[in-house]
Amino acid sequence: MTNSNRIKLTWISFLSYALTGALVIVTGMVMGNIADYFNLPVSSMSNTFTFLNAGILISIFLNAWLMEIVPLKTQLRFGFLLMVLAVAGLMFSHSLALFSAAMFILGVVSGITMSIGTFLITQMYEGRQRGSRLLFTDSFFSMAGMIFPMIAAFLLARSIEWYWVYACIGLVYVAIFILTFGCEFPALGKHAPKTDAPVAKEKWGIGVLFLSVAALCYILGQLGFISWVPEYAKGLGMSLNDAGTLVSNFWMSYMVGMWAFSFILRFFDLQRILTVLAGLAAILMYVFNTGTPAHMAWSILTLGFFSSAIYTTIITLGSQQTKVPSPKLVNFVLTCGTIGTMLTFVVTGPIVEHSGPQAALLTANGLYAVVFVMCFLLGFVSRHRQHNTLTSH
């Protein structure tokens, strides 16, 4: 593979995460305007965004098999066509059914692109370099999550219709589409080059189960925590503005942490540092949940920094459980994380209703403790060390 080709594929991976981050995180900014557009209460409008998450989940799950049937370049180019149709649907339709369908299509495109982006990184880089590259790729999710809400605020403040926000997000996919030209993608399944030696199917092992449970509990815990921090902070007497600043600080330190750990991870065994970070994150979340408002800003900043590398390291270790990176395995771990996203309000909503926001935060803390236990148990069964030794020879 030529260096220019590798750079193009790496940028496609970066932008695939930026696309998903923009679509998921911008929701809160535009929901009120969309509710007004359709003359609906915000509470019922929020349910239609489930179509976005459902599209992401289904496409990540199915793409484990589709990757071996439909070439990656073809998928990305077809995704561009779907993106144009979805954004056009949002612009020219006044039907809630068509809006929901467009959201589902955006979710499908986003999920397919993100799963391809993840696979490209696991395919092109090996060992500890794979972990640092995946982490840097994941930072584009957070970066888009900071940039696109600012773009949305800029447009909405000037009374520009909400659907132009999605047109701006569509420009990310335009860049991906342009990068596919003159770019060679790894061939999979029936399109892969034939070899004389038969390819032995590798068993995944119990380590994949531990990692999948960790991925689900981590995302469910993280989103369950950050979704209810504003309500919890307001209950302690903080202003809405200060409560919002806590969330912004979390994502800012999360992004800085990703950049820092993309260098730090190269010098440590991934399973060991993952166990340490998961334990630290559980302790720091407990400090935040039981601390005074005066210490909240510092504890959420440190929590964001030290938890930033956990999810990507889980995916990296998953990809290292087999000698040859398996798209099905990587997508399975990703799917478990996406299920955590889907379950966020299903799990935390009733808890808040019955016991208040702090109970939801303590539940999230319990989920982080489960992540720590899974990462600790992984140390006894993980195959990443033997595969790293083989690739280094």
Curated annotation (Swiss-Prot):
Membrane topology of this protein: Multi-pass membrane protein
Keyword terms: Cell inner membrane, Cell membrane, Membrane, Transmembrane, Transmembrane helix
Classification via InterPro entries: MFS (IPR011701), MFS_dom (IPR020846), MFS_trans_sf (IPR036259), MFS_TsgA (IPR023528), MFS_TsgA-like (IPR050375)
Subcellular location: Cell inner membrane
HAMAP family: MFS_TsgA
Homology family: Belongs to the major facilitator superfamily. TsgA family.
Protein name per the record: Protein TsgA
UniProt source species: Shigella dysenteriae serotype 1 (strain Sd197)
